[in-house]
């Protein structure tokens, strides 16, 4: 399953982020948030994206724990102590598949890119059958929700996937998470099928890149 806290990316009218290469191997997202200052929203100019390291695990696990508590309060029973657990996150880091968004030198969002997916993905009518990656465990810290970070994090995942040469991103989205569904649909992800996991029904979604 993918995301609970991608719901954080509810920033309509935002210009696409521009991504440039950082000399230390990070991606810099230069962000201009038009009109948000008048709404009391935080006005960020930069996020730093990088691969997660073993020493990040404690902060990453805390971020997911906070997100799970927030989703529970919002009536979104998508994640729990079973998934995503600390072992799963540790393996994501060890395999070099987890990426962090740092805001003010603290992890603010996380995503995972790999080629792992449930056999039920065969239910999807995929437009791109061969050249793709799968987006998992997209999570935005509750402390920065509703400030556009969900959208920016998805954009960073798309940019990374494109840089790796693939033509599409796939994901599964919990049907009881309206915030995530709205985010993905607005960003051009198409519903291509249905699956049922332990926590209930999910949509299979796909976006062709480039």
Model region roles, listed by residue range:
Residues 127-132, 167, 173-181, 185-187, ...:
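C-terminal "cap" of GNAT-fold acetyltransferases
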Residues 140, 146-159, 182-186:
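Conserved acetyl-CoA-binding loop-helix of GNAT-fold acetyltransferases
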Residues 154, 161-172:
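Conserved GNAT acetyl-CoA-binding A-motif
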Residues 31-55, 210:
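Conserved N-terminal entry element of GNAT/NAT acetyltransferase domains
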Residues 54, 67-72, 78-143, 154-155, ...:
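Acetyl-CoA-dependent GNAT
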């Amino acid at each position: 399953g993918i995301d609970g806290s991608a719901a954080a990316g509810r920033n309509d009218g935002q210009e696409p982020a521009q991504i440039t290469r950082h000399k230390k191997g990070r991606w810099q997202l230069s962000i201009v948030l038009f009109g948000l200052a008048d709404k009391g929203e935080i006005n960020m100019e930069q996020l730093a994206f990088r691969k997660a390291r073993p020493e990040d695990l404690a902060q990453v696990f805390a971020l997911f724990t906070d997100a799970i508590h927030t989703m529970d309060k919002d009536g979104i029973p998508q994640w729990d102590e079973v998934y995503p657990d600390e072992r799963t996150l540790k393996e994501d880091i060890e395999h070099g598949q987890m990426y962090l968004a740092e805001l003010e030198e603290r992890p603010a969002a996380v995503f995972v890119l790999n080629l792992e997916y449930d056999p039920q993905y065969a239910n999807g009518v995929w437009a791109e059958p061969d050249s793709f990656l799968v987006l998992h465990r997209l999570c935005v810290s509750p402390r920065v929700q509703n400030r556009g970070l969900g959208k920016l994090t998805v954009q960073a995942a798309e940019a990374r996937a494109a840089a790796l040469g693939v033509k599409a991103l796939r994901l599964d989205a919990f049907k009881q998470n309206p915030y995530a569904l709205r985010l993905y649909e607005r960003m051009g992800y198409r519903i291509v099928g249905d699956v049922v996991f332990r926590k209930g029904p999910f949509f299979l979604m796909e976006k062709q890149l480039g």
